Amino acid sequence: MNQYSDDLKKTMQENSKKLTQLGSILAKNQFSYKIEEKTSKEYWQKRIEHLKKYNETSLAYYNQIQNMMNLINKEKAQIFLLEISKFHQLGTELVKIMHQIEETPSIINSKDKQQSQWSKKIKEKFVEVNTNCLEHEKYMNIGFRKFYDIEIKKIL
């Protein structure tokens, strides 16, 4: 049993190191969910690329967390895997909406008083999905922090 504990501790330390590396990459590439009313196509192209890069790194980060959780509590790890899937789905939906804004940047302009219903719906959906992404990411991080404090700290 002691050998198992030593192996688990070593594996957790290795995973923890990988997680720290991914975390520092994420910190450098931090994505702001703040909505800017920029109406240039170039701005939205850059924003989309930044979000895609951020989501790719975030998925690697969350998958690493899920790997750590799976070593300790498979049930919680499976639930976290569902949360990762939802994060990916929300990110994909946000990128799709941002592509629509990229094609018609005036959608985001709140000063435009003659917006069509279509534009208003896209903007509303953008705000909704953007908020959902932010809230879901917070939820995942809080869940992991709690798991870390309760389960992982006692192993490390």
What residues fall within each predicted segment?
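Cytosolic juxtamembrane helix and N-cap/initiation of the first transmembrane helix
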Residues: M1-G23
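Short acidic DE-rich linear segments
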Residues: N2, K146-L156
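Interface faces of extended alpha-helical assemblies
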Residues: T11, K18, I25, Y54-T57, ...
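Alpha-helical segments in soluble extracytoplasmic regions
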Residues: T20-K76, Q115-Y139, G143
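Prokaryotic Sec-type signal peptides and long signal-anchor helices
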Residues: I35, I84, N130, Y148-E151
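Extended alpha-helical regions
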Residues: M69, L81-E83, L156
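Long, amphipathic, charge-rich alpha-helical segments that form helical bundles/coiled-coils
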Residues: K74-F126
